[in-house]
Amino acid sequence: MYAYIFAFFELITFLVPVLLAVAFLTLVERKVLGYMQFRKGPNVVGLTDFCNLFADGLKLFIKETVKPSSASPYLFFASPVLFLTLALLLWNFMPVTSPALDLQLSLLLVLGLSSLSVYAILGSG
């Protein structure tokens, strides 16, 4: 029982820095592009634009209100979540000092999981 709890916390401690790094790199990209275009950039929400990144991420998930008429609504709205799940699942197989999952055929599993993103694209219409 404790092994599962430990594995879950190890997984969380690996994925949270990945998500924060993506948010920080998005912040840096927006700031650099803002300075290149001689504008200040979006710095009006929260603590030095960090809250704006999470607001933008949330907006990307709930922004699309127009759905194709022939699309299944459950599959159409579950496709972004499937994309995010697959992307975060692939980070578990990165070669680090103590990987969350250490499998013999992890490269083959990474290739198989990365090919599943096609189904998320098909589900989104």
Swiss-Prot record:
It is found in: Mitochondrion inner membrane. GO terms for molecular function: NADH dehydrogenase (ubiquinone) activity. Core subunit of the mitochondrial membrane respiratory chain NADH dehydrogenase (Complex I) that is believed to belong to the minimal assembly required for catalysis. Complex I functions in the transfer of electrons from NADH to the respiratory chain. The immediate electron acceptor for the enzyme is believed to be ubiquinone. GO terms for biological process: aerobic respiration. It is a multi-pass membrane protein. Keywords: Electron transport, Membrane, Mitochondrion, Mitochondrion inner membrane, NAD, Respiratory chain, Translocase, Transmembrane, Transmembrane helix, Transport, Ubiquinone. The chain crosses the membrane at residues 5-25, 74-94, 105-125. This is NADH-ubiquinone oxidoreductase chain 1. The keyword Membrane applies. GO terms for cellular component: mitochondrial inner membrane. Belongs to the complex I subunit 1 family. Its EC number is 7.1.1.2. Pfam families: NADHdh (PF00146). InterPro entries: NADH_UbQ_OxRdtase_su1/FPO (IPR001694). The keyword Lyase does not apply. It catalyses: a ubiquinone + NADH + 5 H(+)(in) = a ubiquinol + NAD(+) + 4 H(+)(out).
